[in-house]
Each structure stands twice: as C-alpha cells, then as structure tokens.
Regions:
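Non-heme Fe(II)-dependent double-stranded beta-helix
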Residues: 1-28, 34-131, 247
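Non-heme Fe(II)/2-oxoglutarate
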Residues: 2-10, 55-58, 197-198, 202-254
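Short, surface-exposed secondary-structure boundary micro-motifs
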Residues: 36, 196-197
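A structural signal for short, well-ordered beta-strand segments
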Residues: 109-111, 140-142, 214-218
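Catalytic core of non-heme Fe(II) oxygenases with the double-stranded beta-helix
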Residues: 118-184, 223-233
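Histidine-centered active-site/metal-ligand motif
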Residues: 124, 193, 199
Length: 254
C-alpha cells in the first residue's frame, strides 16, 4: 500500500476537486466545501460527541489538549465508527494531498466547542516554524453547528501561509487582523486550510449557542503525529478499518 493506492481506494481521483478549488488553496490557503456531511450523519456525529462529553467529563480531551473555555475531545479515531467517514472523506483528502504535495498521514482527530463568552484565540499557525518552501501540515474543520459571528466562527488571513509566524509578524495576534476572513457556513460544511495559514477561533458572544466542530488534522508522513495513532489504536478499531484507512492513519503493519 502507498498513498496513491490508498487515495484511489478511498475514492479520490484527479477530478475530486476542481481547478478553482486548487487555485483557492494555493492563493488564499483555504476553501470551504459545502454539504459534506448530510443531515443523518450530522445527527449521528453530534449524538456521539455529546455521549463522549458526558462519559469523559473533566478528562475530556486529555490525550491531546484541554482548553479553558471550550469543550474538547481527542482520539476520536477510537471513539466511534461514525468518525471513520471524517478522516477518509475523498473531497477533503484531495485537498490535503494538493496542499502537502507528498505522502501524508492523519495527525489527530479532535473536537472543540467554544463555550458562550469564551473561545477567542490569537492568530496562529499549526506549524511552529516559518515557511521554508514546503507545506508540512493541513487541517480541516468539520462544522457540526452553523458557524456565525455569534457563536465564535474561525477567522483566517488569506495568503498568510507563506509568511512568517504570526507570533513574529504581529504586534498582538489576539487583535483583529485587517485582512481576516470568517468561516460563515452551515453545519455539514468543511473548511480545509493549509495549516501554515494564520487562523484562530473568535469569541462565542452568544448566551446559549454551541459551536461544535471536529478538527481533522494531517501532516506530511515524515513528521510526528500530534497523537501517535499506532500507540493509541485499539484492536477493535484496527479490525474494522480497510487497508486504505489504515494507511491514512499510518498503522498499516504490512
């Protein structure tokens, strides 16, 4: 198994994304894919997340990251078959392949829900070094609620994926950037972005709105994963996965 075979087996072709989408990824560093998760899948994913939040309680998200002011979950690969469709989606994989441009793998599969009155993040990039001519990471935000200015939508700065890190380039990454754009889209959409792009969550200014999302994060295959999938993978998870899905996780033992 290799990446080309894995992507083919998962339904990725040269026509999975179009030239305009590729251009947006190259120029802006992000695109929004509409209607990726249908209503039934949305309901199933939301229900499983809520079960996990209740089950894991204060320990939720501890495998990767916990955040004050947000509900977090980590290691979703092992926490429900309903999540398999997330990291194996052909439209998203085609975008990831276009951005990274070489062999890649899943880095982590996590969830985040910024609570009312919380959620503001400074602009940041997910790769901790300045652009060196290659792209090493690419992320996707799966919207499980409608994203709006009210519930803390994500902000991104188009074209920033080839710039220095925002911590170096900006006086205050917490402030609004004059060029920032917002992920305003209905539930079921997926925002795919080159993770070198400056981005961050905005404040959930509502009193009662959820802002649930799954972060499906990929990295070039030579890099370490945010969560070591080989180390964490449960046997029952491994058994149900296709060889192509195992390859994306980098748990293929062949």
């Amino acid at each position: 198994m290799n990446l080309v075979q894995s992507l083919s087996d998962l339904g990725v072709t040269n026509q999975t994304i179009n030239s305009d989408q590729r251009q947006r990824l190259d120029t802006d560093g992000f695109i929004i894919l509409p209607n990726v998760l249908k209503a039934k899948s949305l309901d199933l994913v939301r229900s499983q997340l809520e079960r996990l939040y209740e089950k894991e309680g204060p320990g939720a998200g501890i495998e990767v990251h916990q955040e004050s002011g947000a509900r977090r979950l980590s290691d979703l690969v092992n926490k429900g078959e309903v999540f398999d469709q997330i990291y194996t989606n052909p439209r998203v994989l085609a975008c990831i392949h276009h951005v990274i441009g070489r062999e890649f793998k899943l880095s982590s599969l996590n969830a985040r829900d910024a609570l009312p009155g919380q959620g503001l993040q400074g602009l940041h990039a997910d790769w901790g070094k300045d652009y060196d001519g290659s792209f090493h990471v690419c992320n996707s935000i799966w919207l499980l609620d409608d994203f709006s200015h009210d519930n803390g939508c994500t902000r991104l700065v188009p074209g920033s994926h080839k710039k220095r890190l925002p911590s170096k380039a900006l006086d205050d990454p917490m402030k609004k950037h004059p060029n920032e754009e917002y992920v305003i889209a209905p539930a079921g959409s997926v925002a795919v972005f080159n993770s070198h792009t400056w981005h961050g969550g905005t404040k959930n200014t509502s009193t009662n709105l959820t802002r649930r999302a799954i972060h499906c994060y990929y990295t070039a295959r030579e890099n370490q994963q945010q969560l070591n999938q080989q180390e964490y993978l449960r046997y029952e998870t491994f058994k149900r996965l296709s060889p192509a899905a195992r390859y994306i996780l980098d748990v293929d033992t062949n």
